[in-house]
Design a protein with these regions (language model features):
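Nucleotidyltransferase catalytic core that binds NTPs
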Residues: 1-210
């Protein structure tokens, strides 16, 4: 067997033909974020939620007295800084909800060519992280402060909303927290010295300059 991964189906077929291989297309069809729950590996629980499922999940969590945390972002190219951030988030809560920006919204905020990875790819990678308990897609509306997650925040009403201390819209997000009764917690970007302190945007810029 030879496994060749590529988003371009025709390129895969051409490469297989060149190597004298037969192509087998997966039967799995990605319809929406909920489809990710059927992928392997998983951790025995449903991590990917749509908006209508949030309330039922919260009922049990709050009944069990769990402290709910919330964060949001693009998470385009998952890297060490993200891993450290989620670890910091989990230290402040029992259950962490992550809202990931939709492709259409990220394109509006960051321009053509972004995101590099689709919303389903980004959501799936987030769900694979042990610190992340639930993943939801952000909304279509963009409020001041580049807030595309307000409906999720309002629905979840987390105990804490965790944010990097160098975020460009801290005050706008602080007001959003006040409206839903959440405490805003700022964490410092604290990537260990032996890891590259980088970001998705920096990685993309470096690749484009090569």
């Amino acid at each position: 067997y030879f496994v060749f991964y590529c988003n371009n189906k025709e390129r895969v077929k051409m490469e297989a033909k060149r190597r004298g291989l037969q192509t087998i297309e997966p039967k799995f069809e990605m319809k929406d974020i909920l489809s990710l729950n059927s992928l392997k590996p998983n951790v025995g629980k449903k991590k990917f939620l749509d908006f209508d499922e949030i309330e039922n999940v919260l009922i049990k969590l709050k009944k069990d007295g769990k402290k709910i945390g919330f964060c949001s972002g693009c998470f385009d190219i998952l890297q060490s800084g993200h891993a450290v951030f989620f670890s910091q988030c989990k230290e402040l809560c029992d259950i962490l909800f992550v809202s990931v920006g939709k492709d259409s919204v990220i394109r509006k905020l960051k321009g053509e060519g972004r995101p590099i990875n689709s919303e389903n790819n980004r959501a799936y990678l987030l769900g694979a992280m042990s610190e992340v308990d639930y993943v939801i897609l952000g909304g279509n509306e963009i409020l001041p402060g580049k807030i595309d997650f307000y409906n999720n925040l309002k629905k979840i009403k987390p105990d804490v909303f965790i944010l990097n201390d160098n975020d460009s819209a801290i005050e706008e997000k602080r007001r959003a927290c006040q409206e839903v009764g959440a405490e805003l917690k700022l964490v410092k970007r604290n990537v260990p010295s032996f890891l590259n302190h980088t970001s998705s945007s920096v990685i993309i810029e470096e690749l484009n300059n090569k």
